[in-house]
Swiss-Prot record:
Reaction equations catalysed: N(2)-acetyl-L-ornithine + 2-oxoglutarate = N-acetyl-L-glutamate 5-semialdehyde + L-glutamate
Binding site for N(2)-acetyl-L-ornithine: R135, T274
Molecular-function GO terms, alphabetical: identical protein binding; N2-acetyl-L-ornithine:2-oxoglutarate 5-aminotransferase activity; pyridoxal phosphate binding
Keyword Cytoplasm attached: yes
UniProt xrefs under HAMAP family: ArgD_aminotrans_3 (MF_01107)
Species annotation: Agrobacterium fabrum (strain C58 / ATCC 33970)
Protein name: Acetylornithine aminotransferase
Other observations noted: May also have succinyldiaminopimelate aminotransferase activity, thus carrying out the corresponding step in lysine biosynthesis.
Location of N6-(pyridoxal phosphate)lysine modifications: K246
Note on how the cofactor is bound: Binds 1 pyridoxal phosphate per subunit.
Annotated EC: 2.6.1.11
Entries under CDD domains matching the protein: OAT_like
Cofactor section: pyridoxal 5'-phosphate
Residues engaged in binding pyridoxal 5'-phosphate: G99, A100, F132, D217, E218, V219, Q220, T275
Length: 399
């Protein structure tokens, strides 16, 4: 175990687990214990661990060139951007190293759009309570959660939160200074909460009516996680700008900001930049991820396995009502809203060597790699059931 006085910032409440290697949906500790990884690095390891195509891609690129900066053309960027724009609403792509950076780019793109159109007063962005958009000063302001804002000085100006799904509050918040609306198609850290499709369609209508840009944060929902390449495809709504990260790198730090040509029109030479973003290693991995995710039949298999898993969780909810209150989510972005404290259920799952991720609203996220098989999904269900059964037995003993 780690030393008590490790020379690290004390910013993480880490579980006492040390993983030495991974294979597919499994992680192995230094002592050889095997865990079913339905945390996937918080929806990052889209193709599981040590996927041979990703390993080969990064090995091959590592023997060529790692980094040159954006002072020069990077062929891998052009290839990956072309594939992303051909498969989405977007015309333009800016590569980053993380989701927070992708959101920063999205925010700057929206503000710069209005500035370049002669409306510098339009800089405010409306967001929704319970959202999570990153940990930079701007993105914690966008998220609006006090626990992340506390102690870092005045909140960055220009972000207005409204209650999740509140149409009247949203309409009232739009002013002559509003530049954009920013929303997650499904809130991840907020507790796997999905707004109604009609609400997202209303956002699109309001943006069109008031000359606002619609920004989707698909950092967690994107790249096959919901069973579609991007979650917006399931809503009937296309954004103007979209932030992407996590699954697109399959575990390698990679993010992107996608936009229509019009929305990106203000992002001219010199107004934004990155040193590492779009580096050749990241581009090799991103292209390798898309080789797999965009292959014929892959997303259909994701949807099939997701159905097995979702139906199984629904059955467990019925059988363990004192432990499981509700099943939420889409595809392989699923949440268990617990009746017991979610930390207790997460700990019980970990005792069964199953990994999940805590979220808000007393929810545990289950985020299996997209390569999970139906058999592995059933193994996960068996472990959730064992955890629920142990908590039920514990409750009975107390009673």
């Amino acid at each position: 175990m780690a030393e008590a006085a490790a020379p690290l910032f004390d910013t993480f409440a880490r579980a006492p687990l040390r993983f030495e290697r991974g294979e597919g949906v499994w992680l192995f500790t230094e002592s050889g214990e095997r865990y079913l990884d339905f945390a996937a690095g918080v929806a990052v390891n889209s193709l599981g661990h040590a996927h041979p195509h990703l390993v080969e891609a990064i090995k091959t690129q590592a023997e060529k060139v790692w980094h040159v900066s954006n002072l020069y053309e990077v062929p891998g960027q052009e290839k990956l951007a072309k594939r992303l724009t051909e498969a989405t609403f977007a015309d333009k792509v800016f590569f980053t190293n993380s989701g927070a950076e992708a959101l920063e780019c999205a925010i700057k793109t929206a503000r710069r759009y209005h500035y370049s159109k002669g409306h510098p007063e339009k800089f405010r962005i409306i967001t929704f309570e319970g959202a999570f958009h990153g940990r930079t000063l701007a993105t914690i302001a966008a998220g609006g959660q006090q626990k992340y804002l506390e102690g870092f000085g005045p909140k960055v100006e220009g972000f207005d939160q409204v209650p999740f799904g509140d149409v009247d509050a949203l309409k009232a918040a739009i002013t002559a200074e509003t530049a954009a609306l920013l929303i997650e198609p499904i809130q991840g850290e907020g507790g796997i909460r999905a707004p109604a499709k009609e609400f997202l369609q209303l956002l699109r209508s309001l943006c069109d009516e008031h000359d606002l840009l619609l920004i989707f944060d698909e950092v967690q929902t994107g790249v096959g996680r919901t069973g579609k390449f991007f979650a917006y495809e399931q809503t009937g709504v296309a954004p103007d700008i979209m932030a992407v990260a996590k699954g697109i790198g399959g575990g390698f730090p990679l993010g992107a900001c996608l936009a229509t040509a019009d929305a990106a029109s203000g992002m001219t030479a010199g107004v934004h930049g990155t040193t590492y973003g779009g580096n050749p290693l990241a581009m090799a991995v991103g292209n390798a991820v898309l080789d797999v995710v965009l292959a014929d039949g892959f997303l259909e298999k994701v949807r099939d396995v997701a159905l097995v898993f979702r139906q199984g969780l629904a059955s467990l909810k019925d059988r363990y009502p004192d432990v499981i209150e509700e099943i939420r989510g889409e595809g392989l972005l699923l949440g268990i809203k617990a009746r017991v404290p979610s930390g207790e259920l997460l700990q019980a799952m970990r005792a069964e060597h199953l990994l999940g991720v805590p979220a808000g609203d007393n929810v545990i996220r289950l985020l299996p790699p997209l390569v999970t098989t139906a058999e592995e999904a059933r193994e996960g269900l068996a472990r959730v059931e064992a955890a629920a059964a142990s908590l039920t037995a514990k409750q009975a003993k107390i009673a």
